[in-house]
Amino acid sequence: MLLKLTKFFMIFLINTTINKFDKNKNRFHCYFENGRDYINRNKKKYDAILSDVFIGENLVLELHSLEAIKRIKESLNPQGIYITNIIGSLSGKYSQNIKNVVKTLKQCFKYIYVFKAQEKNEHQKRQNLIVVAVDQEVHFNIVSYHNINQKRYHQGMIDHVDDIDYTNGRILRDKNLL
């Protein structure tokens, strides 16, 4: 019963989002299935792919392995953007996930940008870390983003981080995930 309620809620949430942000109902697509199965058989090209999947607070490693990232990149248009949400910290006890993901993404994408959702200098606090992977340099205008969304975010809430030491991260591979 819980699974049916969860699936019903997700479908409701997805439909509500599409109705609100995709008025023409032809640009936004959401697939409710095993993500790895989808990217393995996908032949379409997308401008953007967003991944926000977890098992509790843990990564779904099958969608963050080098093999999966290669398939995701093959599913993007040449100037496409891949965005994933990671729960963890930038340093300290909860930082291994972000280090592994950044090191793995660096194998496929030229530029990796990480944004943290907490106040500045909160590198050891567990939080949402938004990772953007692209092949062309991007200059983000965070100030105008905050101005548009004043009611939801305060200045400095989303902060770009460019000093992640991922040297002790490991490249995630399918063969090591078993």
What are these regions, as identified by a protein language model?
Residues 111-178:
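Soluble small-group transferase modules, centered on the S-adenosyl donor enzyme superfamily
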Residues 100-104, 129:
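Alpha-helical scaffold elements adjacent to nucleotide-binding pockets in ATP/GTP-utilizing enzyme cores
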Residues 1-84, 91-98, 106-108:
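The AdoMet/dcAdoMet-binding core of the Class I SAM-like
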